[in-house]
């Protein structure tokens, strides 16, 4: 088996383009398994544009954690660490906005390491929980988070160009840093 050495760092404004490209790749691999429809293409190019990531990378309430192999980006986690209410009553904490890992780099420890770093970051900012929304059609993601201690606390809907996608709201209580 080839060696798979990973390095981790905090994202910077100069990473916006590679984060955007990886995001489009992962988004379409996840949602467009039956082909790329216009609604998904529009969402990919609007929500995951370099400009949108550049804006988010400069927000003080967000941190991007990157995982690389050499100089190539394999994945990232976007954490919003200001207090945030989950879209289900009674739950709040830091939000894991997204954790994206290239399909060919999955199941090699990158996602697990990014998630652990995201949890540490949330605790550093005083959060007692980390929550996220995962598409209910993504069995791999739901299994990944359940295996790592995330509880399903409810459901929310995300709308892409008039089409609704159900999301499971997952939450993990965090201990002290």
Language model segments and positions:
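Acetyl-CoA-dependent GNAT
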Residues: 3-6, 10-16, 20-34, 39-106, ...
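Canonical helix-turn-helix DNA-binding module
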Residues: 60, 142-143
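Hydrophobic beta-strand residues of extracellular immunoglobulin-like
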Residues: 63-66, 132, 168
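Conserved beta-strand-loop-alpha-helix junction that forms the acyl-donor binding cleft
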Residues: 132-142, 159-164
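Active-site-proximal glycine-rich helix-loop-beta segment
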Residues: 149
């Amino acid at each position: 088996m080839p060696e798979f050495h990973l390095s981790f760092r905090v994202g910077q404004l100069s990473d916006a383009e590679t984060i955007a490209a990886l995001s489009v790749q992962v988004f379409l691999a996840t949602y467009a398994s039956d082909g790329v429809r216009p609604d998904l293409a529009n969402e990919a190019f609007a929500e995951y544009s370099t400009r949108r990531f550049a804006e988010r990378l400069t927000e003080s309430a967000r941190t991007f954690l990157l995982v690389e192999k050499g100089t190539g980006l394999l994945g990232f986690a976007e954490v919003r660490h200001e207090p945030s209410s989950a879209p289900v009553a009674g739950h709040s904490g830091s939000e894991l906005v997204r954790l994206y890992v290239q399909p060919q780099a999955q199941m090699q420890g990158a996602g697990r390491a990014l998630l652990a770093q995201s949890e540490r970051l949330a605790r550093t900012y005083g959060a007692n929980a980390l929550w996220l929304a995962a598409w209910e059609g993504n069995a791999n993601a739901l299994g990944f988070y359940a295996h790592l201690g995330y509880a399903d606390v409810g459901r929310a809907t995300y709308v892409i160009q008039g089409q609704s996608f159900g999301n499971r709201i997952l939450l993990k209580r965090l201990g002290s840093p």
